[in-house]
Amino acid sequence: MKKEAIQKLVSPLSGEEAVREKLAAHLEELFSALAPEKMGEEYRAALRTENAPAAVRAAAEYFRKKPEAPLPDLRDPAGFDRERADRAVKGEMREVNVDWTFPGGKIDFLFDPTLIRGPRNHEWLWQFNRHSYWSDMAFAWRATGDEIYAKAFEKQLLSWIAGTDCPEKDWNAPGSAWRTIECGIRLLGSWQTAFQIFRRSGEVSDLALLLMLASMRRQALHLAAHPQSANWLMMECNGIYAFSSLYPEFREAEELRKLSAARVTSEMEKQILPDGMHYELSPDYHSVVTGCVLRIYELACLTGSRDSFPPRFAELAESTVMAAVRRSAPGLTQPRTNDCYTIPTAAFTGIAARTLPPRPEYDYINSRRKTGRPPEGKTASAFFPWAGFAVMRSGWEEDALYLSFDVGPLGQGHWHQDKLNINLYQGARELIFDDGGGQYEISDARTYGVSAFDHNTALADGLGQNRDGPRVSPEKIDAGWISEEPFDYAEGTYEDGFGPEKKKLARHTRRVRFEKPDFFLIRDELTSRDEREHVYELLFHLDTLRFTRPESFPGAILSNFGGECEILILPLAVAGEEEPTAVSGRTGAGMRGWYVGRNEATLHPALTVGRKSFPAKDHVFHTLLVPVRRGERLPEIALTGDTLHVTFRGKSRVLDLSALWKPEGEDGAE
């Protein structure tokens, strides 16, 4: 095809010579990359006569008439946001909870509003260039037939192709629209939805459709040439596999499909731990990776390429889903650990139910307990010996009591300095929270959100944990795990550094016992590692500003969420300790008392409860955590030495504070 003819075709699209040359280069690449034998006689005839306009018409006609792609989300979208589609048409955008309106609706895809409206967050531009709003615009067009969506889409698409380039280097740097993660997300997400739907609109030109295909090919080749790691690599493979499977008309399609299948299969073995958890130890990225894997597998099944994957592939995928099910909190969400927001467990089981062999556990989650059954086991609790999560639960009921205890490594990525952290739920209410660390911005809040100061663990001399590893445990973790009908028990130790200098100040051992189904007893042992005295402090975080201090329990804090359940934080054996503190909304160097949320919960003041020792080489904190229903009588407590007597809900228990792993004896603790 003559270059001059192609340049003439694209000349009406822009008055700038550089843009025309770029668009022409896209078309030239497209014509070279399409396999004529797969495109029909009309297209082949246009090539033989070097009739560029005819080739454009024939190629566009071919792709317009192709059957709908076998994408379940395309046929049955989980729902689309009509209001968001309308805003996007006008250039009104929102990313990472930051709004921006482009004047006159003229979008600059390389503009970052957080440069002028802080805090700085590179994710705004990156996530904006995932173009998820194009999916909303496409579904809005299909639902209404209003061509305003199609016209706006073409305008934005051509602007994006003209205005963004893949950098020769540092394509993953701030300000780039060609990060590999965005390319992967686009190629299975918004770009497929937009292409598959808008190709039916007469207001989207033939040239726009073909330029979009040419850009998709460029992005797929970019991903093939520059693989990254961890969850990024899975999203990259997702994009390559989607493009190569949905558009076999391209000469490279088969090679790209095999490359993607090989990469994702190899990475599954590396990234999925033997207990089914993803090695970044974040439910967010566990969900991302599981979704990528299952979407690739689903597409392979729908396009007749299941044999590209060994049986082990589906087994590993199932293990990731079942890990999420076993870890699910009573509200059928995942407890937030490392960088995270609230992830519904159905994000795993929904796609698993239509992709993997059926399991009653998937039905149980997807139906919200109406059908199916929960995981079977000796008890409802579970320990993940490679991830290091101890999950203690009273049962699988909607209002069950639940605690997640982290005794594991940092995680391969997105880690927080929070070993020995706990999350505590009664039903869907998170009584003691881990907020997930907030947006990926450059701010004091983000620094606080990933630090020990925003987690339910211990400080030494006002310094938080600071460790470099291990990111993944080289062997099974021994947490002394016990799970019996009367109680659960787990323990873990932190003995790495504190503060910016990673000083080896102290060793922190936490022991957690769940007296089913009513309360938790925690023993925190802080031991000096340098033979010096230190001030130790325990932190607990509650998403409320309201609380009381019960007169019957000196030093105790009782939350006031105003709901059906509250949490009583009751210090035991408080000799050698200051009066507990309760702080909200403090800023500056001693920041505490904040919920640093992401997506569903933005930054807001919360409550940090602190228990601080007087200077000592060693100190032991004992804490009783008792969820109490509204109007319920508080427990009766008596402590003699290490023997604790608790009477609550008509039942008396006798426990040994020095040996939480022991069963309760008939005549007291054994």
Predicted regions: what is each one?
Residues 1-92:
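Extreme N-terminal leader/anchor segments
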Residues 273, 277-432, 483, 614-620, ...:
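Carbohydrate-active enzyme catalytic cores, enriched for enzymes
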